[in-house]
């Protein structure tokens, strides 16, 4: 009767008390994109809706300024 235990997801930005997400913080943004360059949805990461919108906007700005790639390395 062993049941699978799923760990509860939590929003990292809410826990830290972040007011906004900066597009220049590439290390944080890289945690929320896949290897192919797609933005990871909030149902996977557990990010709150408010911060998911800010995260999406920050990733798109960083892509536009060539701080992040639009796609993978095309190997």
From Swiss-Prot:
The family database entries (Pfam families) matched by this protein are listed as: Ribosomal_S18
Sorted alphabetically, the keyword list is:
Ribonucleoprotein, Ribosomal protein, RNA-binding, rRNA-binding
Q: Does the keyword Ribonucleoprotein apply?
A: yes
Name the SUPFAM superfamilies on file.
Answer: Ribosomal protein S18 (SSF46911)
Q: Name one GO cellular component term.
A: cytosolic small ribosomal subunit
Q: Which InterPro entries match?
A: Ribosomal_bS18, Ribosomal_bS18_CS, Ribosomal_bS18_sf
Q: Name one GO biological process term.
A: translation
**Gene Ontology molecular function: any one:** structural constituent of ribosome
Question: Hey, which family's this protein in?
Answer: Belongs to the bacterial ribosomal protein bS18 family.
Q: What does this protein do?
A: Binds as a heterodimer with protein bS6 to the central domain of the 16S rRNA, where it helps stabilize the platform of the 30S subunit.
Q: How does it assemble?
A: Part of the 30S ribosomal subunit. Forms a tight heterodimer with protein bS6.
Q: What is this protein called?
A: Small ribosomal subunit protein bS18
């Amino acid at each position: 009767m062993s049941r699978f235990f799923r760990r509860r997801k939590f929003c990292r930005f809410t826990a830290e008390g972040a007011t906004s997400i900066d597009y220049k913080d590439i290390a944080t943004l890289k945690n929320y994109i896949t290897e192919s360059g797609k933005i990871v949805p909030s149902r996977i990461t557990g990010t709150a809706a408010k911060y998911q919108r800010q995260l999406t906007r920050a990733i798109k700005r960083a892509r536009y300024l060539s701080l992040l790639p639009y796609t993978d390395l095309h190997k």
